[in-house]
Regions:
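Ribosome large-subunit tunnel/peptidyl-transferase-proximal elements
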Residues: 2-163, 167-188
Length: 188
């Protein structure tokens, strides 16, 4: 039997473009169509093509809102202080609202000007996402969610499922969002 080194195993995951998500026990049934396979108690394999497609579609969707000068309300659960500060400065520069998920409560949209507004939830748990979805539906505000497999994919206007537990995956999403908002658009 051939002995496999740890680095070669890590490289095989990276180069095979497999996205590893939560175990099947924590997966909402609405996300089964994006799974390639699973190990009952360990992890699920997310189809990388569906993930890349939903990510690309999301940023095209976001660009249209940016071009039309919509306001954004970000509700985040970013544990790393460096990533939070970095994203906070991007939001502050663009005058977008940034709220922590821990600060959310029922009725948070009632006192806000919501005309031409989009809510984006980033890395929230499914309970917070569902609370925000109810508010967004009542106020008729589009909701975009970056969340894991535990959330119902129909809980948002646009849902991007993935494994956002690591620093690198969170950094990637926040960097892509920052780039999307920093681009110069022909119509602006």
């Amino acid at each position: 039997m051939k002995n496999i080194k740890k680095n070669s195993l890590i490289n095989s995951f990276i180069f095979s473009k497999i996205c590893v998500g939560s175990s099947m026990a924590y997966t909402d049934p609405t996300n089964f169509n994006v799974l390639l396979g699973y190990r009952k108690s360990l992890f699920a394999l997310i189809n990388p093509f569906s993930f890349q497609s939903s990510l690309k579609t999301c940023f095209i969707f976001l660009e249209s809102f940016v071009k039309n000068k919509y306001d954004f309300i970000f509700i985040v659960d970013i544990k790393d202080s460096i990533l939070f500060d970095k994203f906070y400065h991007v939001c502050k520069k663009k005058q977008y609202t940034l709220l922590k998920g821990s600060e959310m409560s029922t009725g948070f949209l009632t006192n806000k000007k919501i005309l031409n507004t989009v809510i984006i939830t980033i890395f929230l748990n499914h309970k917070k996402t569902e609370l925000i979805q109810k508010e967004a539906l009542l106020m008729n505000v589009p909701l975009i969610s970056f969340s894991d497999l535990t959330s119902n994919k129909f809980s948002s206007s646009f849902y991007i499922t993935g494994n956002y537990n690591s620093f690198l995956s969170q950094n990637l999403i926040l960097t892509l969002l920052s780039i999307c908002f920093e681009q110069k658009h022909e119509h602006s």
